[in-house]
C-alpha cells in the first residue's frame, strides 16, 4: 500500500538543514541505558564472520543522516575493512555525514538517494543499515523488499532496521498540546512503528529482534 508521504516537505523543510534531526538525536542523552543508543545498536551486531574472513565489508547506509552513528562507533569499526556507500535525500545530511565520518578508515562514497528508489544498489552489499528511515517511504512493503534486494547472497549478510514504538515521545507531544492547542499531533513516525514492523518485516526477512 502506498501512503501519501510529503517528500517535498521532508527535503525542503524538515531535512533541508540538520538542525531538526540533531535536536531529536540529543533527546537520547536522557536514556536510562548504560550505553548510548548508537553504541547499543552496534553492540547487537555479530560481525565475527567478517572478521574471520578478513574480507572487505560492503555496507549501504540508507538515510545516513548526520553520521552520528559512525562518529559514536568510530573505534568499534577500526579493526574492519570497510567499503561504505552513504545515502540520504538531502545535501545537508550528506555534507554533515562527510564531516562526521572524516576520520573513519574506510572506502567511502556519498550519494543522494531516496528509500523509495534503491534499484541501483541491488545485490551489492554485505550489510544494509536503515535506521529510523522506513516511515519516510511512500510504499513500506516495496521498500522493505528493496532493502533485502540490496543484500548480496552471502550467508553472513544482514539488514539492520530500527524504528520507534508507537509510545515514543508521547509525553512530549502531551506537554506540547498542553502548552499550545495548535501543537501538531500528526506524526510521520506512526506510519512505521515497532508494532507495525513486527507484522511487516517477517514477511520479507528472517527476524532477530533486539529491544
Regions found by a protein language model. Name each.
Residues 1-52, 68-69, 158-183:
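Conserved class I S-adenosyl-L-methionine
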Amino acid at each position: 500500500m502506498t501512503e501519501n508521504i510529503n517528500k517535498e516537505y521532508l527535503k525542503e523543510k524538515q531535512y533541508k538543514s540538520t538542525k531538526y534531526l540533531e535536536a531529536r538525536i540529543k533527546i537520547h542523552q536522557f536514556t536510562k541505558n548504560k550505553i548510548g543508543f548508537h553504541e547499543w545498536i552496534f553492540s547487537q551486531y555479530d560481525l565475527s564472520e567478517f572478521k574471520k574472513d578478513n574480507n572487505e565489508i560492503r555496507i549501504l547506509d540508507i538515510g545516513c543522516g548526520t553520521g552520528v552513528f559512525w562518529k559514536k562507533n568510530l573505534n568499534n569499526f577500526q579493526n574492519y575493512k570497510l567499503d561504505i556507500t552513504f545515502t540520504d535525500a538531502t545535501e545537508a545530511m550528506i555534507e554533515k555525514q562527510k564531516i562526521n565520518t572524516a576520520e573513519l578508515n574506510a572506502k567511502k562514497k556519498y550519494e543522494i538517494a531516496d528509500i523509495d528508489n534503491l534499484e541501483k544498489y541491488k545485490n551489492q552489499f554485505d550489510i544494509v543499515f536503515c535506521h529510523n528511515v522506513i516511515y519516510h517511504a511512500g510504499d513500506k512493503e516495496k521498500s522493505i523488499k528493496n532493502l533485502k534486494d540490496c543484500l548480496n547472497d552471502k550467508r553472513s549478510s544482514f539488514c539492520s532496521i530500527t524504528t520507534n514504538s508507537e509510545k515514543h515521545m508521547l509525553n512530549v507531544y502531551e506537554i506540547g498540546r498542553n502548552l499550545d492547542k495548535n501543537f501538531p499531533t500528526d506524526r510521520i513516525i506512526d506510519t512505521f512503528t515497532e508494532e507495525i514492523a513486527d507484522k511487516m518485516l517477517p514477511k520479507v526477512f528472517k527476524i532477530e529482534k533486539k529491544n
